């Protein structure tokens, strides 16, 4: 049965893996994972409903550069699924962003020596709350409150499809299902690609990944939420 949405989404962190020194713990130390409960806080304090879950990861660019770690090494040791294999779609051998990629819709893209690269791995909205454009709300809240210093943002459509964790696989395949109904994952991704393109995020080749600047996404998501 469809729930009545009260109109006030909130993200509650379920714990964070803190950054630690890569000199002691390897390249993977420059990544941080964030897990969130998505709640509807529009009702009374005694009536806060769970709406869904979200999972994000963050690459500390300042720590990466300070320790002489290349973006390629950082991608290869990413805790997220399938990031490393798409490196060549975005970067040259010198670590510069490909001009062919920039032509797909990202005009000005670069890695600063501070800030971060954020990856939106999973946003799962319970089917009872479908139809309220909550994915856009969740992403906007995350960028405004948890990713203010970010330079780049990844969006992944089906990030856990190769994971051995069957529960996560089942959850991941439900991403955006209620907003982008289709008969196959590929069709879902194509529809999602059209949606992301409208808000400033081009698809990376034929992969299930999308890429753009945080600022372009903020502008685009505002536009999408107005329509």
Model-inferred region functions:
Residues 132-134:
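A short glycine-leucine-enriched loop at secondary-structure breakpoints
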Residues 1-130, 141-227:
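Non-catalytic substrate-recognition and accessory regions of acyl/acetyltransferase enzymes
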Residues 138:
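Hydrophobic positions on the alpha1 helix immediately C-terminal to the Walker A/P-loop
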């Amino acid at each position: 049965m469809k729930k009545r949405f009260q109109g006030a989404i909130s993200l509650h962190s379920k714990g964070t893996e803190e950054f630690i020194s890569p000199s002691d713990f390897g390249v993977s130390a420059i990544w941080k994972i964030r897990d969130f409960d998505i709640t509807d806080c529009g009702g009374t304090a005694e009536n806060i409903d769970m709406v869904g879950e979200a999972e994000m990861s963050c690459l500390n660019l300042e720590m990466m550069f300070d320790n002489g770690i290349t973006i390629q090494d950082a991608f290869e040791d990413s805790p997220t699924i399938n990031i490393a294999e798409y490196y060549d779609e975005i970067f040259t051998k010198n670590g510069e962003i490909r001009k062919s990629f920039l032509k797909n819709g990202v005009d000005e893209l670069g890695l600063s020596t501070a800030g971060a690269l954020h990856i939106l791995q999973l946003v799962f909205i319970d089917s009872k709350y479908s139809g309220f454009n909550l994915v856009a709300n969740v992403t906007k809240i995350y960028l405004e409150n948890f990713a203010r210093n970010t330079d780049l943002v990844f969006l992944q459509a089906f990030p856990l499809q190769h994971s051995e964790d069957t529960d996560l696989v089942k959850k991941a395949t439900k991403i955006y299902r209620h907003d982008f109904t289709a008969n196959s994952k590929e069709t879902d991704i194509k529809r999602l690609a059209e949606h992301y393109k409208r808000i400033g995020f081009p698809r990376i080749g034929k992969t299930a990944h999308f890429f753009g600047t945080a600022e372009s996404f903020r502008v685009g998501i505002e536009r999408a939420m107005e329509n």
